[in-house]
């Protein structure tokens, strides 16, 4: 895609997507989380992740930027992004998530990544089914569960993830980011 085509397509995006950080270096205000997650990746030991905290603190931006750094051009083959508030039932876990997790990539090495945004909106039955999928496909797939409210997730699901609390952004971080818009 040409640069002018990319520019035109970005012009039509919602503001929040148009200015979403593309790399971890562009994510502001969550330095401890980013440092720790980068260390996991560098050591080849990325666990299943839970990013939780108030809306607008960079949870989705952080995991998408990390995935883009890990997979590069293979992003679309190796990453499944779902908004669990849209697809919150057990059928999505049994079908879409399980199918993606169970399929091995022939030409790509490493694990696949499933990003579940707003997972705190999933039903308990869906969360319990997800726990079983995580256990079964852990050799092949990593999961990043994103939630505003960790207390709405089942204890079984919480216990399978390394938890990171995203803090509200300091005023200075907000001002720095706005300066780039």
Where are these regions (language model features)?
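P-loop/Walker A NTP-binding region and its immediately flanking N-terminal helices
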Residues: 1-179
